[in-house]
Amino acid sequence: WPILDGVLVTAMTYNGTIPGPMIKVTEGDRVKVVFTNQLEEPTTIHWHGVEVPNAMDGVPGITQAPIQPGETFTYEFVAKPAGTFIYHSHYESDRQVSAGLYGPFIIEPRASQRPEPDVDVTLMLSEWLVRDGVTYPAMPMSGMEPNYFTINGKAYPATETLHVKVGQTVRLRLIGIGQFIHPMHLHGFPFKVMAIDGHPVPETAQQTMDTLSVAPGQRFDIEFTPTEPGQWMFHCHILHHTTNDNVDPGGLMMIIEVTP
């Protein structure tokens, strides 16, 4: 998988992409996911934060047997509650999730009490360790710290540029899927935290911020309205995380291009 021009990682994927395909449903929908394991090792899928029956929780050896290579398993549940969630491997998950087995699972509300934003984008934050062309699981331990950092599977300058207009309401769904905390900082405009871990924040409790720490497994929906045109940076403020193999700039950075 190319995280950057000239930098390939050895990855595991859902349907050939990192992150895996976005699954977007409406609250109350009956969800049926037919999963075939084409890896050379067992795996499962866990529906992180989603209220599912115990047998659908995807924990190997506890709620189901690991899905062996070549086997198919069907996950079925009713989508609830509304919010921003994740699907990811729960088999040797420190290694398989680090290798790319994750994706966004979005449950839209059946009847929203809030106006929908003009722009709605999901950003999954992760890390990689590549040494002498070999990919290792990036972990918070000596000798295993990451040297590449990605947004939706890409490191800056390969990260996607977000194009918006002055006056639009922009929602960013921030998802921490790696093993490190990332304080994400927006240049140019403050934002409000609208939801945490899929649960709406009451209007009276919404905080206005410009930097928000996203921990592993956490999800935040933030919203802002650009007031000035230009190219504005959104990046992790652990500044080593904005490098590619210790070369600045790179990593967890993306441009938000605002036009009049």
What is each of the regions a protein language model found here?
Residues 1-74, 116-118, 140-171, 211, ...:
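N-terminal, post-signal-peptide metal-ligating segments of extracellular/periplasmic oxidoreductases
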Residues 33, 45, 89, 105, ...:
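Divalent metal-coordination and catalytic microenvironments
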Residues 39-42, 52, 58-116, 209-260:
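Extracellular/periplasmic metallocenter environments
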Residues 51, 95, 111, 129-131, ...:
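Short loop/turn segments at secondary-structure transitions that flank enzyme active sites
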Residues 122-132, 138-192, 219-224:
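Surface-exposed interaction/gating patches
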Residues 185-204, 239-241, 253-255:
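Active/binding-pocket-proximal capping segment
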